[in-house]
């Protein structure tokens, strides 16, 4: 038999027979290693222990000590057990893609005989547990691609997935009458799946394309230890309670009307108040930092986006152009930068004017697929807190640091502390996706990296995450659901100033090219509101809360006028307050104020009327305190003015 040469992590090389598996290699080293092994790497790719090795390459044995791979193998095996169980109960079921996610797995299925309901999951879980208790080993067999197609005949989606496999051999996993593939790594036997849970059922288009068949996606998770599963389920429950879609419904913040269209939210009065407060804050903050706010059209001639490059590189995310019938094609703008360039070009510019900072709360439209839409986080119409600075080359580093400092000030005002920095570069292997200028990319990426190093900030580097016209610094955070989101962005751009032939008159009297810096402080109003709703769990800080205080008179006939006087004074001071004079019990009104997450509940009765005080109960606290009404009003006005949750100005996370 032919031989292959395998290279170990320490550089040592050894010859083995062709088709040797990594498990065989582990056994040749030691029995204990083979027992601990759960997977391996071949030329950097994670593969199954029993994957036949057909050519020379570098190998690595992965043991249970590698928690990440161990979890992935656990999730793959649990998904395999799920599919094997479903195949017994639904013989006609078609199986699609199976995927290990960041915290579990899902399997896409299609069953013409009937859908799997959420209420079916407990019974399916019971049957899975029986299969796991059997302790049956999972057999592996390597077959040719043609033989695999024969094995999966009748499984439409599996055959389609096989067509995408480039290798001539396919590793097939078998358990009883059920077979599957593309699940590496997997555990050795079904009883290795110790603790698992089936979570939910949702719809998903085959391979994510809305033109394809809608399938059923069954979600689950599994862990080696019960306490790990319990912790995960607790986290998921907490995430559900923080879900901005749930809270948005409870607090009457927004809704989406299917008659109008998916991804097009209506902002209800409460949500609109929160958004308006954010917008006013942002405008004031930016103006104080040298930005000039503008309004620009949400429609533009298609030629503008052809010149900017959006039409070539971003077309799939843009709505189709509107033919005006006279040769003019109008496009809903996907980004604001070309519009701000036109503002810059409206006047001749001098080096003395730079940096020129232009900002806008600019409405944009993105052609998002329906399957990607989610509440306020992913929408088709959005308003971006956008800004563009035009600088001389010698101003780049200082302006970058200035923008980053402004961002961190904003995070402090919103009490946001959990975020990381990511330098997003182009993928040099994907030249079609990005503006093709190696010198520009290398220069811009080096500048961003140098600025971050100068500041001593930790960051990760990510290839393939840049925009098509330049690298960027992304500020990353996680939603309550555990999804990573980009909170803010700073991006260097040498391309658009060249495409639009931007100039300024230099000190030497000659024309020079400015550098453009794109930045978004808090993403879109939609996404930022969703994010804040989740991190605050709906208990917005007083300055953002739709209703900042509710006043409850003990007896309307005796105490209403006093309550109204307090309300009028608070409104005069710019506060949002209402009186609850409904004919309901006092306890009911107080509980409702708490469930509505109103920051302050004020009760006024005989004592308060006689002493010009209010009984103040802060949200989340059990006890009320008596305060002079004027002192309370002064205190809440100061709290709102400080943009904080506790009446104190928060400090920056880092000093620049």
Swiss-Prot record:
Catalytic reaction list: tRNA(Thr) + L-threonine + ATP = L-threonyl-tRNA(Thr) + AMP + diphosphate + H(+)
InterPro entries per record: aa-tRNA-synt_IIb, aa-tRNA-synth_II, aa-tRNA-synth_II/BPL/LPL, Anticodon-bd, Anticodon-bd_dom_sf, Beta-grasp_dom_sf, TGS, TGS-like
Organism placement in taxonomy: Bacteria, Bacillati, Bacillota, Bacilli, Lactobacillales
Domain of life, source organism: Bacteria
Function: Catalyzes the attachment of threonine to tRNA(Thr) in a two-step reaction: L-threonine is first activated by ATP to form Thr-AMP and then transferred to the acceptor end of tRNA(Thr). Also edits incorrectly charged L-seryl-tRNA(Thr).
HAMAP family on file: Thr_tRNA_synth (MF_00184)
Cofactor(s) for this UniProt protein: Zn(2+)
Quaternary context: Homodimer.
EC number: 6.1.1.3
GO CC annotations, alphabetized: cytoplasm
Enzyme class, first EC level, given as a word: ligase
Subcellular location as annotated: Cytoplasm
Domain TGS: 1-63
Name this protein carries in UniProt: Threonine--tRNA ligase
Residues where Zn(2+) binds: 337, 388, 518
Region (Catalytic) location: 243-541
Details of cofactor binding: Binds 1 zinc ion per subunit.
Family that this chain belongs to: Belongs to the class-II aminoacyl-tRNA synthetase family.
GO-annotated biological processes: threonyl-tRNA aminoacylation
Organism: Latilactobacillus sakei subsp. sakei (strain 23K)
